Amino acid sequence: MAAIEHGADAVYIGASRFGARQSAGNSVEDIGKLCEYAHRYGATVHVTINTIIYNDEFEETLALVRELVDVGVDAFLLQDMGLMSKVREIVPDTVALHASTQCDTRTWEKAQWLSLQGFDRVVLARELSAEEINDIHKHLPELELEAFVHGALCVSYSGVCYVSQYSFGRSANRGACAQFCRLAFDLKDSDGKTIEHQRHLLSLKDMSQIDNLETLMRSGACAFKIEGRLKDINYVKNVVSAYSKRIDEIISKHPGEFRRASLGRVRYSFTPDLKKTFNRGYTNYFLKGRQADIFSPDTPKALGEFVGRVKEIRRDSFNVSSTANFANGDGLCFLSRDDDSQSTRLEGFRVNRAVGNRLYPFKMPRGLKPGMGLYRNQDQAFDKELSGKTAERKIAIKIWFGASPETSPNPSKGEECLTDSRGTIWAKAEVIDDRINHISHESESNECSQDSSSTYNFHQRISNEHPVRLSPSLGGAGGGLQLAQKPQRDNIIRQLTKLGNTVYECSEVEIVDGADKYFIPSSILAELRRMVVEELDKQILNMQRVTIHRKSVDKVSDHKLHISMVNPSQYQQLPYLYNISNDAARKFYEQQGLPKAEPAFEIQYPTGATNGSDSSNKAFSIKGDKEAVSHLLMQCRHCIRYSLGYCVKRGGQKPTWREPLFLELPDKRRFRLEFDCKNCQMNVCNVT
C-alpha cells in the first residue's frame, strides 16, 4: 500500500505460494485488501505465480488463481507454459496475463511467440539495451513491454539459472534461489594458477535507470518495474517516490506524448534520495551497451552512499573529510584488505556520537586507516524522516453545481420520483489531471432514493459523456427552492469540498447560472457531495475492468511460429532449458512441435547434484580438455574476462593465463567459464 500511496501505478506481489520469491508470500485476504486500496486510484495489482509447477501442485495452483480472481487482481505474471495453457482458459477477459521475466525474452521473435500464446504483456530480460527494446517494440507495436528499472540484478538470464539447484538443491525457478552469485570465488586458469582470490566475481551492482526513463519510454517500454524483494517500507517509499516524481517531470516536459496509468497526484513531505536506500552501487547495466563497471567484486552487501575519507584517527574517534552531515546512530562501513591477502572485506560500525565531522563509534573498528573511503549504509536522520507520514495521494476533481426551481423537462426512465415542480439541484464532477486520458463511461445508470425523514428527494445519473458526470436532483417543500437572504456561494463551496476522508480533493467549484442565490441546507449539499463521490468511485472501478481482446486458444494454435525459432541455440542442445515440470507443459510443447520434451533440471535433480556426478545429459563437451562440461548452469551477459580488462575483441590486454578458466568455491567445487565471444556471452557450467 505504501507503493500506491507514494505514486505507483501498479504493484506486483507474491501470493502464498508459487511466486519467484518463496520467502515473500502474502495471503489471498491481504491481496484482496490491497486490490481494494489500489483500485481507488485506478492502480492495478499484479500477482506473481512465476515458478515452474509440479504435477501434484497443479490443481492447487489453479484453485489459487480462481481465489485471486475473486478478490480482484488485475493480472498474473506467469512462467510455466503448462500453467499458462490452463490459466488462459479460466480467467475472465478483464484479467491480464503477463509473461514473467523468467520466460527469458531477449528478442522480438520470442516476444511475438509469447503474445501468440495469449500473453498481453511481456516483462523483458533485464540485460536488454535500449536499442534491443526498441527493436521489439517496432516489430510488435501493440504488445505491452515492461522493463526493470531499479533494484537487485540476477547475473544469469532469468529462467535459465540452475546453479542454485545444482549446488544447494534450491531452485531459482521455484523461488528458492540460494544467491550463488553473491558468493566469493577464486578465479583459476587451467593450470591451477590463481588469477583472483576470494572475490565476488558474479555479484552485480544494483540497477538504477532513474536518469534513463525517457530513453526507455521512447524505446517502447510502457511499464517500469522496481525490484523490492524483502525490502523494508522505507525502501519502498524512497524508491517509488523518486521514480514517480521523475516520470511526472518527463510527462510535464512533453505534454501529450506520455500519460500516467493511474489517478492521483502525490504530495511528498520528504525529498527522495536513491543514494540513501539499500544499494550495492548503481549501474544502468546494458541499457547503453556493454560496460566494464557493472559488478561489485569486493562485497555483495550494501555499501550505501559515499560520504568522504578518513582523515585522522585517535584512540576512540576519527575525523572525516566530508561535506555530509552525520547523526548519532548512523551506520557506516568501509572496505579493508589485509596486507598479506588479495581479498577485500566489508567492515561496518555504528556511530555513537557525532560532533561535526568527528565521529565516535560504539567500538573503534580495527581495520580503519587514514585515507580509506567511508560509506553510509544507514542514515539515521533520513530513516527518521521516512518513519512518519511521508506522502498524500489525492485525485483532483472539479465540481459543477446548479439549481433550478423547475424539474427536468424530459425526465428519463427511473426519474418517476420527480414529477412535481418543487425544484432541482444538480452537480457533476470531473477528474482533473493533465497526465492521464479522461475517464470515459459508455453506459447509463439511474437510481432513485428517498429519505423518509426528509422532504427532499435525490436522483443520480451517470451520463455517457466524457468525463464522469453526475446529476442528482432535489425536490423541496413549501413552494420550491427559496431565494436566500444572504449569499450562499461560500457555504456551497465549503460543503462540496469537504472531501477529507476520501481519495479526492476539489480544485475548483463552478456555480452555474446563479445557483448560489437559492438557499440549500448544508445537509442537502453534504448528501449531494456523498453521491458525487460514490459515483466517481464507481467510474474509476469500471475504468479498471477493461475487456482484453485476447486471442482464443483455437486462434493461438493456428500460428506456427516454431519454438526452435524463438530461443537461443542452446535450447535445442539442452531441452531442459524449457523448464518442463508437469504434464500440461509437456503436452503444450509437444503441440508446439518440440521434438524432445525433456524434464526440467529440477525434475532430473530434485535435491541438487554433486560435482562429479555422472549424467546422461552431456552437453558442450569439448574434446581434448582435462575436464568435460556436463551442464550449462548459467547464461550471463556479464563477462568476467571483459570486466577484468582482458577482452581482446574489445581492446583489452592479452591474457597471461591459459584457458579454460574456473570459479572455485572454498570447498573446492569448481565451475567452468565458457566465453561465447560470437554472442558476447559468458556461460557458467559444472565440471566432471
Q: Model-derived features: where do they sit?
A:
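Short, glycine/polar-rich helix-capping loops at beta-to-alpha or helix-loop-helix junctions
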Residues: R106-K110
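Alpha-helix capping/helix-boundary segments
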Residues: G82-L83
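Periodic glycine anchor positions in long extracellular repeat architectures
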Residues: G414, G475-G476
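Surface-exposed amphipathic alpha-helical tracts and adjacent flexible/coil segments at the periphery
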Residues: M1-E5, A10-A20, L34-C35, Y41-I49, ...
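Conserved phosphotransfer cores of two-component systems
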Residues: V91-P92
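Aromatic- and glycine-enriched glycan-recognition loops and surfaces
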Residues: S23-G32
